[in-house]
Structure formats: structure tokens, C-alpha cells
């Protein structure tokens, strides 16, 4: 009988919710008698029905919620099914062997399981012809882990997981479940407390703030972006002009944000009209708080359900790719929120965060910092990045707050941080993680770009890992952004005293590969919108917007502009309302957008503005000494080719010069390509005069141009 097969101590552990290996008590138990026994644990039930070889049987109540049915020898897990309390008829979860393998453990615990998203969390799968969901969790401090959901009435004793190893892997395959099932983890901590957590590896969640995960299938979508993906893998250099977007506040319809599928069509059409090559999405990983803009993440493997399902997000990506628009995702591996339902003290003890409070809690954001010394934690983060690239076809990751990851003292006072093993302030583990991240991405996903939002002078951010660098493709040039705004916020009368703010960034422009960002960070928290930062009346402010954005386009570095900046949004950005699109009914806003579209088109079609732009060869000063008139001029070359160039002239004062002479030697021909003061862009119409080559005894030494107020003029120049 069952008495001989189940030790009372094991049964007590099962009933009390502390049994780490429920499979040794449940499922098919072989005996020395003529029969084997199917054992089911159903706490609170009065009867359990079992379908055996097509016939209905009622199991015998044993004790403490345990039921058994004697069956002939040779019965396997495929020969019977169990009626669950919710009416589901499915195979027995406790009749299956372990599915998490030794190679999984080996790779995961050394931080190199690059497809961990296919093995951890809730994975729809088929085992020996039987469909179900494999639930796997890492919780090394837990006494018991159960999966709870609608399917078991959220009862933590019904579906306890089996502990696979001493390193804290728990597993259970539950037949009969599928996509859309709601679930959470119920965990018994070392101290005996029962806590309920959402799934760190969850791929879909109910709308915030519930945090309830849903089983989602990331494999079923039929992609049609093969041409894009093939072309991306072969592209080594090209123009990158990025439209930074917060999906929840770009456009609304009937008082709500657009869905992923609605957004796909409108955003792709808009980006094509405006000649953007990429969109960068503020984090769409699941997050509980709208006001965090997505930067406090609880679901690192899930697109937020605010705008639709996982498959609808895949459609969003697919459609933009078909329209030749790349997608960059803001990704936050530096810190996570303290919300009790998510990663914080996940199994009752610090797990994803540092153990020491001073190092764990980040003073800037009141969030936890990841413990990069744990291989399982870095594998979790690495898996998240690779998931978005593999299953979601994302084209780039912009890593947020890199400086906070690089330094142990970031945002902390003396005594609030501990030095590394060498006594320094660098966070050696996170530096190694970033190198590992970039190495794997560039090896596994050719053509994918990585961007670092890094605000310090840390050396080698965009240097190759094998040369001692971090391995990013590009670094945000926050110094350029700060200096540029410092200059442009000055009255044009006083800008001559601040010319160095324009020229300083060019002295270090080629030490890294840079992005020139005009980002969301500059239009929030009382900073005002871009156009309202600028002095003067309406015409003057919009003229300065045109010269600001053309200045960004012409300099070496990839380009990024936050939504609304392209048409002169007046109000400061808020994540809780859409942009003021009705402004496009007004002349200045409409013509500014025309100018931005023309600038982007010029940038894309002129290799002078993007070819080999991380090399000093692409740039040559013509004049940066005309401080009195607030004029700078320079050539942009297409690599080492010196037969032609773009001549970019920026005029930052309100004066007009009908005849302005630049020292440009050897010019054969000069053609005006773009003038931001053109009337079609809202300008005064000055500056369109054909340039005149100045000669002395047949030798070309300069150019005589008409220089409009607060404007950029761009010429195509050929040389003798």
C-alpha cells in the first residue's frame, strides 16, 4: 500500500508546504506489489477523478489531501489524465522526468546561457507529444516554490515545483496549460514567510500595477522582415538619424494612446515622411509606474501590455522593418525598482541586488542596483538583451545610465560605498558585464548597434573589447548637448563671449564614436521645450531652432531628436498626454518640420555627413575665429576623398551679411544645397544668392556668400 511508499516525514513536508521534491511522493509510484500507484495531492478536495486508459476512476482518499489509485504495472504518464479543480482534464504534472538539464545548469551558473529565455520562466512546449507549460525558476534561498494561477485557484500547495539542484533551480512541467494563462510564484522563505512574486522571466503581464504574469509564446509569430534582417547583417556603415519616441504620448486616439499595431502604421509613415532611419523607444519593457517613463523595469522580457500583446509588438517591429525603419530599445540593466512584488529580495533574501545596503540602494533613484558579481544575475540581464534581439528583432540597444554602472561611488558620498579589490572606485564586475554584453551581441547579431548613455570621461567606451574597451558602437555625447544648450540659451548679442561652447566638443569628437542627442531629458522637470529654451520673439526662436537642428545634422556623429522637437512643441513633455499636433496648423511649426525633413534627407543622401565620421579625416575647420559675428565654418569630407566636400556655415547672430567672405583655397565650384533661412522653412528668404569664387591672378582663395541671420547654409564644393 501507499504507507510503504511514502515516509510520514515527507508527507508532513508536502502538507506543510516545505517539500523540495514533490515528485518522489506524487505521480506514478512503483511498488513491490502486483500494482503500482498513482498518487495525487489535492488539498481541500473530497474526491479526485482520473481517466485511465479511457475509463473514469475515482482515486481513494488517503490522508491530508493525498489520493491514490492502484494501477497495473507498466502504466506510464501518457496512459492517464487527471481532472483538475477548474474542470481541466490533463496529464499529471508529477509524472514527468526533469527537463532542466545539466548543461543548462552549467551554462546558467557561469553566466553564459545565451538562450536562457527559452529555458527559464514559463515556456509553452510539448513533451513526448503532450502539450503544456514548463515552469522554471531560480530561487536558491527558498524552502518551497509553487506556481499559482487561475488554473489552481491560486492555491500554493497544489503545484509545488521540484528543486533540481543545490544551486536553487526549481522546475515543474504542467500539461494542459497554454498561452494566456495567468500565474505568479509563491515562495516560502528561509524564515518560513510566504511571499508571492511575479516572474522575472515573464514575457507578458496584466496591465499595471497588478504584476500578474501570463504565459506567452514568443515563437509563433510569422516574420516577414527577412530582407531587412539580411541587409542589416551586411551593413557596416551608414546614416543614422534617430527619432526618440515615448509610445504612450506620441499620438492618441479617442482619449487613449495608440496600440502597437496602430502605432506601427502611423509611426512608420511619419518616419518615412521625415526621413528618419531609426526610432528609439523609451523603455517598453514592463514597468508599474507611468511616471518612471519605463526606466524602472519589473518585466525585463516583456513588452508592456499598455499598448497590446507580445505578438502585436512583434507586428510593430515587423511593419517598421518592412518600411525600412530600424528600432532601438532603451534598456535598463543598471538598477531596478524596490517594489515588493518583483525582483527585490526575490526569494526572501537579496538575490538580484547587492547584499550590503549601502551598495544595493541607489541614492539617485531610490532603486536597487544589480549584483554583477553573481553569474546568474548577469545571465538574467544578458538573456534579456538577447531576447529582444532574437525574438523581437530589435536593431539596437541604448544602455541607460552606464556611468552609474561603471563607478561604485556614483551618486554616493564618502562612507556610502566600498572600493573594489584594488582599492579603486570602478565597478569591475559591471565593467566585465558590459564587455561581455557587447561581445556576445556583436558576435551573435551582426548589424545590431549598441549605444551607451555615459556622462563621464571613462576611456574606451566605443573601443573594441579586444583592445581594452567596453565595445559599444556609439556613446551619447552629453558634453556636446550641455555645451550646445549653454550657448543657444544666451542672447545672440552675448554669444561671442561663449564661442568655446561651440568649438570645444570638436577637440574630443574623434576620441569615441558619438551620438549627438537632443533627448527627452532636456524637455522635462521644468527645463521647458526646445523652442522655449531659446531667447527672442517667435520668429527668432524658430530661426534658432532651425540653426540648432542644422548644426546637429552637420557635425560628425549620429543624430537623435526627441519627438516634438521637429515641429517646435511649445509645452514641456509629459508622459500623460499626447504631443500638441494641432500646432502643425500654424506656419512656424509646419515650416520648421519641413526644414527638419529636408535636413534629414540631405543627411541621408550626402555621404559627406556620415562616412567615416569617427575619423579626424572627415572634418576640417575653415573658420572658428569670427567670434564678433558668431560664425563658424568647416568642411565635411567623405572619408579620405579630398576632391569634394560639403561646406557648412553656421551663423548664430541676427545680423545679415549680403557679402561674407570665407578663406577657402582651391575651390573650383560651389553649389548651394540647403539654406535654413529659406522662406519654405519659415525664414526671411535671404542667403540664396549663388556663391562667388574669389580669385587672385587665377588662383582661387575664397568664397563670397550671402549669409542670412540665425541660419545655416550648406554648399557642395569641388576642388581643383
From Swiss-Prot:
One of its GO terms (molecular function) is cation binding. InterPro entries: A-amylase/branching_C (IPR006048), Branching_enzy (IPR037439), GlgB (IPR006407), GlgB_N (IPR054169), GlgB_N_E_set_prok (IPR044143), Glyco_hydro_13_cat_dom (IPR006047), Glyco_hydro_13_N (IPR004193), Glyco_hydro_b (IPR013780). Its EC number is 2.4.1.18. One of its GO terms (cellular component) is cytosol. The keyword Acyltransferase does not apply. CDD domains: AmyAc_Glg_BE, E_set_GBE_prok_N. SMART domains: Aamy. It comes from the Bacteria. The active site is at 400 (nucleophile), 453 (proton donor). It catalyses: Transfers a segment of a (1->4)-alpha-D-glucan chain to a primary hydroxy group in a similar glucan chain. One of its GO terms (biological process) is glycogen biosynthetic process. It holds the Pfam family Alpha-amylase_C. Keywords: Carbohydrate metabolism, Glycogen biosynthesis, Glycogen metabolism, Glycosyltransferase, Transferase. Pathway: Glycan biosynthesis; glycogen biosynthesis. HAMAP family: GlgB. Catalyzes the formation of the alpha-1,6-glucosidic linkages in glycogen by scission of a 1,4-alpha-linked oligosaccharide from growing alpha-1,4-glucan chains and the subsequent attachment of the oligosaccharide to the alpha-1,6 position. Monomer. Belongs to the glycosyl hydrolase 13 family. GlgB subfamily. This is 1,4-alpha-glucan branching enzyme GlgB.
Amino acid at each position: 500500500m501507499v504507507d510503504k511508499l511514502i515516509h510520514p516525514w515527507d508527507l508532513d513536508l508536502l502538507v506543510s508546504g516545505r517539500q523540495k521534491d514533490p515528485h518522489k511522493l506524487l505521480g506514478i509510484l512503483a511498488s513491490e506489489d502486483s500494482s503500482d500507484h498513482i498518487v495525487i495531492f489535492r488539498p481541500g478536495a473530497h474526491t479526485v477523478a482520473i481517466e485511465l486508459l479511457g475509463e473514469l476512476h475515482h482515486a481513494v482518499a488517503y490522508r491530508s489531501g493525498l489520493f491514490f489509485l492502484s494501477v497495473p504495472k507498466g502504466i506510464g504518464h501518457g496512459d492517464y489524465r487527471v481532472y483538475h479543480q477548474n474542470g481541466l482534464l490533463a496529464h499529471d504534472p508529477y509524472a514527468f522526468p526533469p527537463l532542466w538539464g545539466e548543461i543548462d545548469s552549467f551554462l546558467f551558473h557561469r553566466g553564459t546561457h545565451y538562450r536562457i529565455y527559452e529555458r527559464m520562466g514559463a515556456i509553452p512546449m510539448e513533451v513526448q507529444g503532450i502539450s503544456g507549460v514548463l515552469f522554471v525558476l531560480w530561487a536558491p534561498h527558498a524552502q518551497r516554490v509553487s506556481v499559482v494561477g487561475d488554473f489552481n485557484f491560486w492555491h500554493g500547495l497544489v503545484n509545488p515545483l521540484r528543486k533540481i539542484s543545490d544551486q536553487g533551480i526549481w522546475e515543474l512541467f504542467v500539461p494542459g496549460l497554454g498561452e494566456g494563462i495567468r500565474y505568479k510564484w509563491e515562495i516560502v522563505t528561509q524564515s518560513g514567510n510566504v511571499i508571492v512574486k511575479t516572474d522575472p522571466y515573464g514575457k507578458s503581464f496584466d496591465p499595471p500595477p497588478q504584476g500578474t504574469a501570463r504565459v506567452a509564446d514568443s515563437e509563433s509569430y510569422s516574420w516577414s522582415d527577412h530582407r531587412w534582417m539580411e541587409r542589416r547583417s551586411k551593413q557596416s556603415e551608414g546614416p543614422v538619424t534617430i527619432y526618440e519616441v515615448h509610445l504612450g504620448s506620441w499620438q492618441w486616439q479617442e482619449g487613449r494612446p495608440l496600440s502597437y499595431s496602430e502605432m506601427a502604421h502611423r509611426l512608420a509613415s511619419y518616419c518615412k515622411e521625415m526621413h528618419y532611419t531609426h526610432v528609439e523607444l523609451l523603455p517598453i519593457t514592463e514597468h508599474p509606474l507611468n511616471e518612471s517613463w519605463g526606466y524602472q523595469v519589473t518585466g525585463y522580457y516583456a513588452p508592456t501590455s499598455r499598448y497590446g500583446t507580445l505578438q502585436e509588438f512583434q507586428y510593430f517591429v515587423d511593419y517598421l522593418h518592412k518600411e525600412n525603419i530600424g528600432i532601438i530599445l532603451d534598456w535598463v540593466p543598471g538598477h531596478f525598482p524596490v517594489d515588493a512584488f518583483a525582483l527585490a529580495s526575490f526569494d526572501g533574501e537579496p538575490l538580484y541586488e547587492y547584499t550590503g545596503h549601502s551598495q544595493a540602494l541607489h541614492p539617485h533613484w531610490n532603486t536597487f542596483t544589480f549584483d554583477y558579481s553573481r553569474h546568474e544575475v548577469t545571465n538574467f540581464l544578458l538573456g534579456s538583451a538577447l531576447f529582444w534581439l532574437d525574438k523581437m528583432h530589435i536593431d539596437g540597444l541604448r544602455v541607460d545610465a552606464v556611468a552609474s554602472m561603471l563607478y561604485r561611488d556614483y551618486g554616493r558620498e564618502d562612507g556610502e560605498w566600498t572600493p573594489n579589490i584594488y582599492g579603486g572606485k570602478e565597478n569591475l564586475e559591471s565593467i566585465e558585464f558590459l564587455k561581455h554584453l557587447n561581445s556576445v551581441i556583436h558576435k551573435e547579431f551582426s548589424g545590431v548597434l549598441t549605444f551607451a548613455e555615459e556622462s563621464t570621461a571613462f576611456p574606451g567606451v566605443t573601443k573594441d573589447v579586444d583592445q581594452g574597451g567596453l565595445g559599444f558602437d556609439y556613446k551619447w555625447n552629453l558634453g556636446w548637448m550641455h555645451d550646445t544648450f549653454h550657448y543657444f540659451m544666451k542672447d545672440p548679442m552675448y554669444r561671442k563671449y561663449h564661442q568655446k561652447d561651440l568649438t570645444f566638443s570638436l577637440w574630443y569628437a574623434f576620441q569615441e564614436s558619438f551620438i549627438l542627442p537632443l533627448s527627452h531629458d532636456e524637455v522635462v522637470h521644468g527645463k521647458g521645450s526646445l523652442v522655449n529654451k531659446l531667447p527672442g520673439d517667435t520668429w527668432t526662436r524658430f530661426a534658432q531652432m532651425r540653426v540648432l537642428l542644422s548644426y546637429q545634422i552637420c557635425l560628425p556623429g549620429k543624430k537623435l531628436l526627441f519627438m516634438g522637437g521637429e515641429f517646435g512643441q511649445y509645452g514641456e513633455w509629459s508622459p500623460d498626454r499626447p504631443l500638441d499636433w494641432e500646432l502643425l496648423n500654424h506656419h512656424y511649426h509646419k515650416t520648421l518640420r519641413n526644414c527638419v525633413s529636408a535636413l534629414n534627407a540631405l543627411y541621408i543622401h550626402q555621404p559627406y555627413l556620415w562616412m567615416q565620421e569617427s575619423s579626424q579625416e572627415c572634418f576640417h575647420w575653415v573658420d572658428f575665429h569670427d567670434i564678433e559675428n558668431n560664425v563658424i565654418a568647416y568642411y565635411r569630407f567623405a572619408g579620405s576623398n579630398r576632391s569634394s566636400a560639403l561646406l557648412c556655415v553656421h551663423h548664430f547672430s541676427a545680423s545679415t551679411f549680403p557679402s561674407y567672405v570665407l578663406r577657402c583655397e582651391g575651390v573650383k565650384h560651389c553649389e548651394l544645397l540647403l539654406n535654413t533661412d529659406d522662406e519654405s522653412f519659415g525664414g526671411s528668404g535671404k542667403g540664396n544668392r549663388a556663391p562667388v569664387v574669389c580669385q587672385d591672378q587665377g588662383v582661387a582663395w575664397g568664397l563670397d556668400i550671402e549669409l542670412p541671420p540665425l541660419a545655416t547654409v550648406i554648399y557642395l564644393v569641388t576642388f581643383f
